[in-house]
Every structure is written in C-alpha cells, then in structure tokens.
C-alpha cells in the first residue's frame, strides 16, 4: 500500500505493526497482508501537520482483470461497465456515465443476479446484486434542456464547503446518467465504491416528497408513513393524510424541489430526497434559462452532499405514455425497500 505522503511512519494491520518498505520525497510504501475481495481495516500513523496521529482506513483489494473477465463473459458482444476500478478518476467515471447500461455493470466485490426490466419506461434501469444490493440508473439528459445550458454551470463554487471527497461525490450528480447503489441496512459494500456511485442506505424512513404525485405513489405503495417533509404547502396538498399530519406538524413543508429549506430537512432528519423533474430545464429552454436551472441544480446537490442526504429525481412525468409513467413505481419499490408491493 502506498500513501501519497512521506510522513507515514507505520501501518497497523491484522494486529501487527509494519514499517515502510520504501519512501520517496512524496510517498511512503508498506507491504502488508490483506484478504482478497474483502474490506480490510488498516491504521496509518502520520506526522503530518506537526503532530503524530493515527488514521483509520478501509481498503478493498481485488484483481481488476478478473472483474473485467467476468464482465466480458456475459457481455454478448455489448459493452459492459466495470464499477470500482476508476477510483478517484472523475474523468473516467463521467465517461462511463454518459448513457445507461444495456448490460448490468460488473461491480467490484459484488455478484450480479438479475434485472428488473422496464417494458415501457426509458429513463431508468434496475440491476440486482448479492446481499440485496441494487444498482439504479437514471437518465438525467434525454429530453431536457441540459445541452443548451453549456458546461460552465458545472464549475463548483469555491465556497461550497465541500472537502475533496465530498466534491467527488457531488460531481456524480452532474453526470448525464446518475448511478445509485441502494444498500440494505446490514449489507457491506466494498470500500471506494462511493467514488463512482451515490450510495443510498436503507431504511429510507425520513423522506422528502417533492410533489403530490410522489406523495400519492408512496401512499399506494403503503409507504406514506416514511414521509416527514414535503415540497407542497398544506393548501396545495392533495393527500388528506399528509394534510392532517401537516396540521399536527408531524410532516413539515420544507420548500419546493427547486428551493429547498435545508434547515428543515436537517431538523427532520431527512435521509432521502425525492424531487420532481422540475429541477431540470425543459427541452425547449433558452440558453440563459437552462444555464440558470442547471446551476441551481448543481448548487442544490452540493448542499445535499454536504448534508449527506441522497437526491433522486423522479422523471416519471417525462416518460411517454401512462404505462411508462406508471412503471416508475418499480423505482420507488427499490429505493423504499418494498419490492413485493405494487401500487393499486
């Protein structure tokens, strides 16, 4: 293992202490035992910043070529994405997220099992892996005004307050296709995957529902009790149960999808935000309007990353036809952990 710093003095692993095997002016290397295809906990001691201190790391060690071979074996001539090999290389991650995958990606450390097919919907893909882990892909580009917005809206604010790791995570929201890893409460995922996918931990039981349609679908799926904040005011809410809860202050209005009240989200312990696609520019938007909308979207996702609240945009209304729109209930079933339930 090599650290990009010359200040590391030792590493603790498997109950033993290991000293540098090599050192340069900019790095320190150690030879340590690890278990393959499993998360390994190590502790490194560094004298950087004047004071000696230990830092705990989790590393996942694998043979990349084996993963690529597995992907090729089920590709049937199609391109297969391998998630977990790009690390912090955001340019490669962005390239892999320009379009939705036709074949389930190979995810380092996870075993692919099945796909929930979308017969009509065009803007999402759902792939299932072991441990009950699911990969959800959502197309954030097709039939939007994103192209008109240009590229300058992607430039992160210098006052965003995000550290380098958070900046990497926030950048995932700027991809044309966003990949989410839906992870059950007790499941363990390989270290480093959060650099390439947005991790949504279940249970998502303090949900912000950004629209009446989201509220309605959650009620049909029997998940209304998970809604704690909403994006519609009481006088515009069409759900009587939520209106009553708002009157009792059990459910709080936390701003619209395009203008969130972050303090209220934090106060109500929001752990998942389901936004309407109104946060994206419409296809015929002017350059100015599209840029303004995408800039606001970027700033919003930066803040939500800082607050550790995953954001999922519901593009059901952008689908063509009622059958395609209805199929988005499959997305809700996955993210809310109610796969066996169907909307009436």
Can you say where each PLM-predicted feature lies in the sequence?
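A short, structured surface patch at a secondary-structure boundary
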Residues: 134-138, 145-146, 150-153, 157, ...
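Sec/Tat-exported extracytoplasmic proteins
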Residues: 211, 219-222, 269, 277, ...
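N-terminal soluble domains immediately following signal/targeting peptides that reside
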Residues: 2-84
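Short, hydrophobic/aromatic-rich segments at coil-to-beta transitions
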Residues: 40, 130-135
């Amino acid at each position: 293992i090599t650290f990009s710093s010359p200040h590391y003095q030792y590493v603790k692993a498997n109950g033993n202490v290991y000293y540098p095997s090599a050192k340069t002016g900019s790095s320190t290397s150690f030879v340590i035992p690890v278990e393959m295809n499993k998360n390994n906990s190590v502790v490194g001691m560094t004298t950087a910043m004047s004071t000696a201190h230990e830092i705990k790391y989790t590393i996942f060690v694998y043979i990349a070529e084996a993963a690529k071979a597995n992907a090729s074996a089920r590709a049937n001539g199609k391109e297969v994405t391998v998630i977990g090999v790009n690390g912090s290389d955001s340019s490669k991650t962005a390239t892999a997220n320009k379009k939705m995958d036709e074949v389930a990606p190979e995810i380092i450390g996870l075993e692919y099992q099945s796909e929930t097919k979308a017969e009509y919907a065009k803007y999402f893909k759902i792939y299932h892996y072991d441990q009950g882990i699911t990969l959800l892909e959502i197309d954030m580009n097709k039939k939007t005004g994103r192209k008109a917005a240009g590229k300058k809206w992607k430039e992160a604010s210098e006052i965003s307050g995000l550290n380098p790791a958070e900046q990497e995570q926030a950048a995932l929201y700027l991809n044309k296709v966003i990949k989410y890893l839906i992870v059950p409460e007790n499941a363990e995922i390989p270290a480093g995957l959060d650099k390439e996918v947005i991790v949504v931990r279940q249970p998502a039981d303090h949900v912000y529902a950004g629209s009446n349609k989201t509220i309605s679908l959650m009620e049909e799926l029997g998940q209304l009790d998970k809604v704690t904040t909403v994006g519609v005011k009481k006088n515009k809410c069409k759900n009587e149960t939520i209106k009553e809860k708002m009157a009792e202050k059990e459910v709080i209005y936390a701003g619209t999808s395009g203008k969130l009240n972050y303090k209220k989200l934090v106060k109500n312990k929001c752990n998942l935000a389901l936004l309407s696609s109104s946060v994206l520019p419409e296809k015929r938007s002017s350059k100015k309007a599209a840029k303004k909308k995408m800039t606001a979207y970027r700033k919003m996702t930066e803040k939500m990353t800082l607050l550790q609240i995953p954001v999922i945009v519901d593009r059901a209304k952008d689908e063509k036809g009622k059958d395609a729109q209805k199929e988005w209930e499959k997305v809700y079933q996955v993210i809310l952990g109610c796969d066996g339930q169907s909307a009436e």
